[in-house]
Amino acid sequence: MKFLFDLFPVILFFAAFKLADIYTATAVAIGATVLQIGWVWFRHRKVEPMQWVSLLIIAVFGGATLVLHNETFIKWKPTVLYWMFAVGLLGSVIGWRKNLIRAMMEKQVTLPDPVWARLNAAWAGFFAAMGVLNLYVAYQFSTEAWVNFKLFGSMGLMLVFIVAQSVWLSRHMPENSQD
């Protein structure tokens, strides 16, 4: 359910684009993200740092799109977010010797240190590649194709990557012996 809640602004962006245009969709995405953050705050009295980052990025890039009436800015938004994730994952290891993927998952999964390092690097590489791919689609295809890619293509690639990671991780997880 959290996954669908997190997709709320993207789904509304997609619907608004189909019903109107990129500028209406951008305004809807900004409003939906503000409402989403407000709801999270109302329910939990706490908002995750990444949700604040997402709000900041949609406000800046979406705002620039609306003020300057230039869709290029909103098309850069996913790339900036993906690259921030990639830099965050690699930077935390290089600068603070902290593996963020491990910090998020180690309560659910036990893995050897080298596997955690590869997993973190794989996610950083995935996000970096997704940023490049987003720009490729944004500049080589129509705005409509980019909007479709933003919802279906990027989510599909994320799902494929998660499944591939799960298969790869299953080979490295310790077996539970039941006597």
Curated annotation (Swiss-Prot):
Record keywords: Cell inner membrane, Cell membrane, Membrane, Transmembrane, Transmembrane helix
Protein name: Inner membrane-spanning protein YciB
Organism: Cupriavidus necator (strain ATCC 17699 / DSM 428 / KCTC 22496 / NCIMB 10442 / H16 / Stanier 337) (Ralstonia eutropha)
Keyword Electron transport attributed: no
Organism domain of life: Bacteria
Recorded GO CC terms: plasma membrane
Similarity comment: family membership: Belongs to the YciB family.
Entry's localization field: Cell inner membrane
